[in-house]
Amino acid sequence: MLLLDSQVFGVPHGELSEYQLEWMERCLEAYPERYTLLLLHHHPLPSGCTWLDQHSLRNPHTLAAMLWRYPKVNTLLCGHIHQELDLGWHGRRLLATPSTCVQFKPHCTNFTIDDVSPGWRYLDLLPDGRVETQVFRLENDDFRPDMDSDGY
């Protein structure tokens, strides 16, 4: 597993710095035979939420171009969108995990809270590089977000 820092201080969007990209490449070159799960906070592809996609990873094409040299990086995991996703991205699997707090409603133009319960994603990393995963959510109404909030 490699955890990349996509935070840009003081702004909501993400970007992988030159340092992070070089560090990732050094790590991947050191163990080319190992499967690697790549984790980062910001989503590298459009989520379908106009308001949220302006806060995505700003240099996803740079990341994708670098990863072509490393076929054993077959799964990426991100957060930030507070939604559950399991999609293909440049020939790899991209997972997004729900938030353990407030969920954002999918496919919205403006900020919208979803009434889906907080959740988390369980991962089982298999020796052949596959990732088995399941999303779990709180089963009761212990957590109810303020549906009228204009930001979280």
Give the role of each language-model region.
Residues 1-36, 52-65, 113:
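Binuclear metal-dependent hydrolase catalytic cores centered on His/Asp/Glu-rich metal-binding motifs
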Residues 1-8, 37-39, 92-98, 134-136:
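Active-site-proximal beta-strand elements of phosphoester/diester hydrolases
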Residues 9-10, 42-46, 82-84:
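Short, catalytically relevant binding-site loops at active-site mouths
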Residues 10-12, 46-50, 105:
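A short acidic, helix-capping loop that chelates divalent metal ions and anchors anionic groups
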Residues 13-15, 106, 142-148:
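A short, polar/proline- and glycine-enriched secondary-structure boundary/capping micro-motif
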Residues 31-47:
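Short acidic, glycine-rich surface-loop motifs adjacent to enzyme active sites
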Residues 52-122:
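Conserved beta-sheet core of the metallophosphoesterase superfamily
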Residues 121-152:
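A short C-terminal boundary segment appended to hydrolase-like catalytic domains
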